[in-house]
C-alpha cells in the first residue's frame, strides 16, 4: 500500500527550510539539518524535493512569503536545468525590486501633491519588503557563499534600485518638492534602509523583545519618519509686529 503524505508536511518543510536557510545559508545547510528541525528522517524529505538546491530555487521562484503554500502536483520538486534556473532566478529577483508606484512617480515631471506621491511610494516599498521578508532574508544570507547570486542580487539589482530611488529623490529636490540640504544618495539610502530594517531585519534582531508597538503601528511611524526626512519644513508663520 502506498504511503500517504501528511497534508501539512510540505508547508512544514517550507517553513523549516526558510528558517534554517536564513540562519546558515544555503551552501552550509544540509538536508539533515532541515529534517532534524522538523523531527523527521532525512530520507522522507526526498519525497518532496530532490535536493536543497531544488528547494531553494523553488522558494525563490515562488516568492514564498508568509502564509500557506500549496504543494505542487508533481513531487518531488526537481532542480531546473542551469540556464533555466538562472533565468527564473533573475526574473523573480527582478520582480522583487520593481515598485510600480516608484516607476509611476519617476515618470511624472512634477507631482500634483509631493507628500501624497512620496507616501504612496514609501508604503509600496514597505509592503513589498514585508511580503518578501523570508525569501529575501534567505537570499541575503546565502549570497556571500554563491558568487553568481551575489553579483545578481547585490551588485546589479539592489544597487540599481538604490540608484533609481536616489535619481527620483534628486529630481524632486531640483523641483523644490523635497528638501535639498542633503545628498540625494544619502537621503535615498536613509529612507530605504529605514524601511528595510523595520519591515524585515528587525524580525531577526538578537533582542526579539525590543519594546516596539505592533506591526501596523510600526509601519505608520516609519512612514511618518521617512516623509519627515525628505519633505521640506513648512514655512513658519510670520510674527505680527506690535
Q: At which residue positions do the language-model features occur?
A:
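Short hydrophobic clusters on alpha-helical segments that form packing/core surfaces
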Residues: 13-21, 125
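Short, Lys/Arg-enriched anionic-surface-contact patches
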Residues: 1-12
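Membrane-interface starts of transmembrane alpha-helices
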Residues: 184-188
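Helix-turn-helix
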Residues: 20-67, 72-77
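Short loop-to-helix capping motifs
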Residues: 24, 51, 131-133, 145-147
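C-terminal peripheral helix-coil segments that are non-catalytic and often amphipathic
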Residues: 79-102, 116-119, 123-131, 159, ...
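Amphipathic, non-transmembrane alpha-helical scaffold segments
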Residues: 60, 151-162
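Secondary-structure edge/capping motif, primarily at the C-terminal ends of alpha-helices
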Residues: 136-143, 202-206
Amino acid at each position: 500500500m502506498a504511503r500517504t503524505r501528511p497534508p501539512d508536511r510540505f508547508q512544514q518543510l517550507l517553513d523549516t527550510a526558510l528558517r534554517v536557510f536564513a540562519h546558515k545559508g544555503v551552501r552550509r545547510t544540509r538536508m539533515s539539518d532541515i529534517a532534524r528541525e522538523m523531527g523527521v528522517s532525512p530520507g522522507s524529505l526526498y519525497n518532496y524535493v530532490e535536493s536543497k538546491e531544488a528547494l531553494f530555487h523553488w522558494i525563490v521562484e515562488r516568492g514564498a512569503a508568509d502564509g500557506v503554500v500549496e504543494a505542487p502536483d508533481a513531487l518531488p520538486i526537481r532542480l531546473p536545468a542551469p540556464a533555466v534556473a538562472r533565468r527564473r532566478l533573475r526574473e523573480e529577483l527582478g520582480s522583487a525590486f520593481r515598485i510600480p508606484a516608484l516607476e509611476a512617480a519617476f515618470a511624472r515631471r512634477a507631482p500634483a501633491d509631493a507628500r501624497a506621491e512620496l507616501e504612496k511610494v514609501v508604503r509600496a516599498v514597505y509592503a513589498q519588503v514585508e511580503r518578501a521578508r523570508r525569501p529575501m532574508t534567505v537570499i541575503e544570507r546565502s549570497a556571500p557563499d554563491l558568487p553568481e547570486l551575489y553579483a545578481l542580487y547585490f551588485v546589479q539589482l539592489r544597487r540599481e534600485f538604490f540608484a533609481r530611488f536616489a535619481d527620483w529623490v534628486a529630481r524632486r529636490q531640483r523641483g523644490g518638492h523635497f528638501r535639498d540640504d542633503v545628498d540625494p544618495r544619502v537621503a535615498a539610502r536613509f529612507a530605504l534602509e529605514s524601511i528595510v530594517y523595520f519591515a524585515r531585519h528587525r524580525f531577526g534582531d538578537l533582542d526579539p523583545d525590543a519594546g516596539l508597538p505592533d506591526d501596523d503601528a510600526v509601519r505608520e511611524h516609519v512612514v511618518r519618519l521617512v516623509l519627515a526626512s525628505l519633505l521640506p519644513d513648512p514655512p513658519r508663520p510670520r510674527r505680527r509686529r506690535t
